[in-house]
Amino acid sequence: MAGTVAVPEGITNPPIDELLKVCDNKYALVIYAAKRARQINAYYAQLGEGLLEYVGPLVETYPTEKPLSIALREINAGLLTAEPIEQ
């Protein structure tokens, strides 16, 4: 039966295998995406105040899209760079 199937977004799109090509391991990917998602969330929160301290989303977004989904798509598109921190 032919029907319409929703295109998966967020955690399932982009696939984890593609995202792991960008980061060394899945734990680094989680930290990387979470930090960027916090920046995106802070950007949306400060829009009403007129402050522009954080950079907004670098990819096209949808009104109901979560900051983590946006961050994962930015990472997959190669729009962000992460540098390891020496301890």
From Swiss-Prot:
UniProt xrefs under SUPFAM superfamilies:
RPB6/omega subunit-like
Q: Which UniProt keywords apply?
A: DNA-directed RNA polymerase, Nucleotidyltransferase, Transcription, Transferase
| Any one cellular-component term (Gene Ontology) | DNA-directed RNA polymerase complex
The EC class name is transferase
User: Which biological processes are named by the entry's GO terms?
Assistant: DNA-templated transcription
Cite the EC number.
2.7.7.6
MF GO annotations: DNA binding; DNA-directed RNA polymerase activity
An example of a Pfam family matching this protein is RNA_pol_Rpb6
Provide the catalytic activity annotation.
RNA(n) + a ribonucleoside 5'-triphosphate = RNA(n+1) + diphosphate
Protein task: Promotes RNA polymerase assembly. Latches the N- and C-terminal regions of the beta' subunit thereby facilitating its interaction with the beta and alpha subunits.
UniProt cross-references to NCBIfam families, sorted A to Z:
rpoZ (TIGR00690)
Give the family this protein belongs to, as stated in its UniProt record: Belongs to the RNA polymerase subunit omega family.
Q: How does it assemble?
A: The RNAP catalytic core consists of 2 alpha, 1 beta, 1 beta' and 1 omega subunit. When a sigma factor is associated with the core the holoenzyme is formed, which can initiate transcription.
* Name this polypeptide is given: DNA-directed RNA polymerase subunit omega
